[in-house]
Structures are given as C-alpha cells and as structure tokens.
Amino acid sequence: MKLVVSVMPKSLEEAQEIDVSRYEEADIIEWRADFLAKDDILNVAPAIFEKFAGRELIFTLRTRQEGGEIELSDDEYVALIKEVAGFYQPDYIDFEYFSHKGKFEEMLEFPNLVLSYHNFEETPENMMEILSELTSLTPKVVKVSVMAHNEQDVLDLMNYTRGFKTLNPEQDFVTISMGKVGRISRIAADLTGSSWSFASQDMASAPGQISLSNMKKIQEILNEN
C-alpha cells in the first residue's frame, strides 16, 4: 500500500511555509483545497504544485456534505476542479460521485479520477451497492471512507473490499473505516486489497488516522522476514 498524507493550508502564507522535507516518507500528497476560501484556491495552487513538483499529488475539494470544509454548488465544484486540473495536471482528481452525480459526465475527460464516497455518520447497509456502482464506472481509483461504530462495521467493509478486489483485480480500491475501532482497516490495507492508506502529519484529516511516522514503523514490522 502507498501512504497518503494531506496538506491543508488555510492561506497562501501557510502554503508557502510548508516544509516539504517532513513529507518525504509519504508516497502521495493530497492537497485538501477545501480549507481555503473559494476565491483563494487558484491563488494558492501555484505554491502547492511548486512545493511538491515531481511528487504524486491528489487534488481534493472535500465539501461539507462529505465531511469537508467548503460549501459549493455543483457548478462551482466542477468549475474549480476543471480550472486547477487544466492548469496543473494533478496525478489524481478526487470527485465526490454521489454528491455531484449529475455532473459526472462533465468529468469524463479526466482519466485520473478518484471517485469517492464519504460518510462521517455510519457504515451504511448498502455498502455493496455503493461499491458496485463506483466500480462499474472504472475510474482510476474507487475510494470509500465510512464511519465505523463497532467491530462488525469494520469487518464488513474489509470483507467487501477483499471481494471486490478479487473480482476486479485491475481496479484500484481505497477503503477506510473511520474512527478508533476502524484503525485496523488502515493498517491492513494490503490484506484487504486497498491500494492506499491515509496517514497524518501534524493534523489528521479524518477520525482514526495514524501518524505517518507510526505508519512507517508498522509497515517495517509487517514487512520483516
């Protein structure tokens, strides 16, 4: 599994002050642009892409309805993504499929979509249907992150992930059970067939995240002969 770490600057100054050396052990950088005001995103973008030039980067606008920090209309959401993607060509573009389903066809020009679904309230009973619909669209990555309230929620998501990966070996999946009880899903990504795990540096971007340094230690232990 690859380790993803999010950067969440709230201003141009914060973006310029990012110490990239602290992110060297991350495999992929996620820029959570939703921590900025809508009108500041394009002003901050050059600093982010310059800082992390040569690194794999995900551009993410996490809206409030999926646990993020920004409120945008469907049109604003797609327009911002297209503008940033057109100028800077991020390696991956996060698209909240179920929240902006009516705009999905406008995103088909991008071959590097991370079709995502986030639920900070629960692990819904229709997880299989959610995974099935996202998988049927054959994006670059299928990403599902849901809140776990008990051990069964975690085991269900891990089992679904393993099953979908077995049936769709060419498809990249990223699945996360959020919350303390779900931490095992972050550690066991290789076991379930999840391609990435999200780790934190300074501030967690979701409940239950483990620090980058601890995730590296866990990887070393699991990879010992």
Curated annotation (Swiss-Prot):
Active site annotation, chain numbering: H118 (proton donor/acceptor), K143 (schiff-base intermediate with substrate)
Family: Belongs to the type-I 3-dehydroquinase family.
Superkingdom per UniProt: Bacteria
Lineage start: Bacteria, Bacillati, Bacillota, Bacilli, Lactobacillales
UniProt-recorded name of the protein: 3-dehydroquinate dehydratase
Entry keyword Amino-acid biosynthesis: yes
Keyword annotations: Amino-acid biosynthesis, Aromatic amino acid biosynthesis, Lyase, Schiff base
Annotated gene: aroD
Top-level EC class: lyase
The reaction(s) this protein catalyses: 3-dehydroquinate = 3-dehydroshikimate + H2O
GO BP terms: 3,4-dihydroxybenzoate biosynthetic process; amino acid biosynthetic process; aromatic amino acid family biosynthetic process; chorismate biosynthetic process
GO molecular function: 3-dehydroquinate dehydratase activity
Enzyme Commission identifier(s): 4.2.1.10
Keyword match Lyase: yes
Function: Involved in the third step of the chorismate pathway, which leads to the biosynthesis of aromatic amino acids. Catalyzes the cis-dehydration of 3-dehydroquinate (DHQ) and introduces the first double bond of the aromatic ring to yield 3-dehydroshikimate.
Binding residues for 3-dehydroquinate: S6, E30, W31, R32, R62, R186, S205, Q209
